[in-house]
Structures are given as C-alpha cells and as structure tokens.
C-alpha cells in the first residue's frame, strides 16, 4: 500500500498530530517516510540552498530530530529541507521521491487568509495524483 509517505512539517506544535499518526501507518505498511519542511522566509526564497539564517539552522536541526525519532522506532526516514513556495515545493518532492501518500497537519481555517490566498493543503491536494491525508491538529 503506502511505501513512500511524504510528511510535510512546519516546525510548529501542530506537527505532533501527523507525526504520531504516520508512525503507526508506516509501521503497518512497512513504508518509508520522507520528512519535508519548506523554508519560505526571505533568505530561503532569495538564496535557496545557499541561504544562511538562524531559521534555516533551526529548521535543519528540527528535521534531524524528527528523523531520529522515526528511525529509533525502526521506521526508515529521510529528512529534506526545501526552499521557496511551500505548495510548489511539496508537489515537486512528491514527484521526485515517488511518494504514494502525502500527509499534512492542518491549522484549521483562518477565514480571510484562506479565502484570498488559499491554503497549502488545498493547493497540494488539487495538484498531486496521490492520496493526501489531512489531519487537523488539536
């Protein structure tokens, strides 16, 4: 079933819900996990992989910590840091890694921002050809 699961992380407490859910799912399917965070600050959007900032350092450390958490439970996991527009980068990584499931936490609606800008999850689910698991954080 799901052999390669892309888990998008934003570095906030809402990540915990999807992390715990995917640990269980990956164990059931004996799948591997690709953890992805898209740095989208000014430095990341301007300089891409050459960006240097405290945020990039924190993002990298966070990804490595979460990867170690999966690996300590026997789940093959890799951590990837992308740069730029989150929806576009997520879609690109789904295709590059051959993922057969995308897993995302959602923050819930923020009304006006969602109406005018849309949400990352909406853009992703309308752009990929694989299932998208959306889990609302508590």
Regions found by a protein language model. Name each.
Residues 1-49:
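Small/aliphatic-rich secondary-structure junction motif
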Residues 36, 78-82, 133:
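General small-molecule cofactor/ligand-binding pocket signal
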Residues 51-54, 96-98, 120-122:
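Short, hinge-like loop/turn segments at secondary-structure boundaries
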Residues 52-64:
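Short, surface-exposed alpha-helical segments at coil->helix boundaries
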Residues 68-102:
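Structural beta-alpha unit
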Residues 7, 33-35, 62, 69, ...:
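Short, structured motif recognition centered on aromatic/hydrophobic residues
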Residues 105-126:
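Glycine-rich, Arg-bearing micro-motifs that act as flexible, cationic patches
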């Amino acid at each position: 079933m799901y052999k390669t699961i892309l888990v998008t992380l934003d570095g906030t407490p809402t990540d915990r819900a999807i992390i715990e859910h995917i640990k269980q799912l990956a164990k059931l399917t004996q799948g591997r996990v690709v953890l992805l965070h898209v740095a989208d600050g000014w430095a990341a959007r301007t300089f891409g992989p050459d960006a240097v900032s405290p945020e990039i350092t924190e993002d990298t450390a966070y990804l490595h910590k979460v990867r170690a958490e999966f690996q300590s439970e026997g789940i093959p996991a890799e951590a990837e840091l992308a740069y730029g527009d989150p929806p576009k980068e997520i879609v690109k990584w789904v295709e590059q890694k051959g993922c057969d499931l995308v897993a995302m936490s959602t923050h819930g609606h923020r009304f006006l921002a969602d109406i005018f800008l849309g949400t990352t999850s909406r853009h992703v689910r309308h752009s990929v050809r694989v299932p998208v698991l959306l889990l609302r954080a508590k």
